[in-house]
A protein has these predicted regions:
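N-terminal amphipathic/basic leader segments beginning at the initiator methionine
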Residues: 2-39
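Short, amphipathic C-terminal "tail helix"
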Residues: 6, 14, 319-321, 326-327, ...
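Short, charged, amphipathic alpha-helical segments
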Residues: 21, 154, 222, 316, ...
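Mg2+-dependent prenyl diphosphate-binding active-site environment of isoprenoid biosynthetic enzymes
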Residues: 25, 30-33, 39-277, 320, ...
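Alpha-solenoid HEAT/Armadillo repeat architecture
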Residues: 43, 57-58, 270, 285, ...
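Residues at alpha-helix boundaries and the short loops/turns that link adjacent helices
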Residues: 59, 63, 93, 150, ...
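A short structural micro-motif
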Residues: 163-166, 227-228, 286-290, 307, ...
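Mobile late-domain/C-terminal helix-loop "cap" segments
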Residues: 278-330
Length: 353
């Protein structure tokens, strides 16, 4: 692995924003630059690990975490070029979590093609995920070459390390309540705060820190990231029912197959009739004992979620977090970057993948 991040950064990267189409969350210049940096990171590497990391990183995803870091840095008064290495590393860390998640969940597809563990084997996938995590920290340290002070780099490292620790706790909590329909919404929200929102928060806070932002800017952008992460995860729960596998690039039955509790299922069990509750219990029991077809299980659950209003209630909760995320930005000076962050919060609950 070669850490090229930052070496091709253009200090004149635009702070203004072209109109953002629905499917885009970054100005085209940022997307192009980030993708170029990803290619440089693995260029020339002829070892198996390099090949697997290239496979994991491409095709690129939504690049949401890099946008949060880049735009948070600029919104806090810094320059995107100075924090580019950290943005590259943030995407590497995110991809690492996907590689490991697919192994834990037994999901065979990711972004419309075989998951890393299916393409290269379980052991190699674990190692590649680990390598991408460590590469994240190296990229953060590489911000020194762009002129970021050591004190800010150390602070950003601490924020990201804490987020990684929180993510592990969130993953553990998810395993603890797996298939337990008595799990309440409060426990679920704590789980996604740890598992998902923590890394959103870290991307925003580390961008603000590395960009030279004030303590208030770091706090506000962290709160924005918390609410954005919650909105994003709840909407993710809904995509299985609102989108197709072709749109999402992953199986619609993954949550049910893994007996993973989502907000719609929790709300349906809390508010549903005795018959609805029994249906959910029978489905999870059948999946656990392999006595029910996965597609039939999905259809049965979908009917219960529609009948109880759990899908619409979950959409409302996601929209509430999206709104709260946007409210945090009011404290920051008006800027194109703050506007783009607000756009991301809206996009988080309107996307179809």
């Amino acid at each position: 692995m070669k850490s090229h991040a930052g070496k091709t950064a253009d200090p004149s990267m635009p702070d203004g924003a072209p109109a953002l189409p629905r499917e885009s969350v970054l100005p085209r210049e940022y997307v192009t630059l980030l993708n170029s940096e990803f290619e440089l990171c693995w260029a020339g590497g002829d070892r198996l690990l390099d090949e697997i990391c290239r496979y994991a990183m491409a095709p690129g995803g939504k690049l949401l975490r890099p946008i949060l870091l880049l735009e948070s840095a600029v919104a806090a008064g810094g320059r995107a070029a100075d924090v580019l290495p950290a943005a590259v590393g943030t995407e590497c860390g995110h991809v690492a979590s996907l590689v490991h998640d697919d192994i834990i969940d037994g999901d065979d597809t990711r972004r419309g093609r075989p998951a890393v563990h299916r393409a290269h084997g379980r052991d190699n996938a674990i190692i590649a995920g680990d390598a991408l995590i460590f590469f994240l920290f190296r990229c953060l340290a590489d911000c020194r070459a762009t002129g970021v002070g050591d004190d800010r780099i150390v602070s950003a490292l601490r924020v990201v390390a804490q987020a990684g620790y929180d993510m592990c706790h969130g993953q553990s909590l998810e395993a603890e309540v797996c298939g337990d329909l008595s799990c309440d919404a409060e426990t679920y929200l704590e789980m996604i705060r740890l598992k998902t929102a923590a890394f959103f928060r870290a991307a925003c806070q580390s961008g603000a820190i590395l960009g030279g932002g004030s303590a208030e800017a770091v706090r506000v952008l962290g709160a924005y990231g918390d609410h954005l992460g919650a909105a994003f995860q709840i909407h993710d729960d809904l995509l299985a029912y609102d989108s197709t596998p072709e749109q999402t690039g992953k199986s619609a039955v993954s949550d049910i197959r893994n007996r993973r509790l989502t907000l719609p299922v929790i709300l349906a069990y809390e508010t549903g009739s005795a018959a609805d509750r029994r249906t959910l219990e029978d489905v999870l029991h059948g999946v656990q004992n392999d006595t029910i077809d996965e597609d039939a299980a999905f259809r049965a659950v979908h009917r219960v979620l529609e009948r109880t209003g759990a899908l619409e209630a979950s959409r409302g909760r996601a929209r509430w977090h999206s709104s709260r995320a946007r409210e945090q930005l009011a404290v920051l000076p008006s800027s194109p970057s703050a506007d783009r962050l607000a756009h991301v919060a809206r996009l988080a609950v309107t996307r179809d993948r």
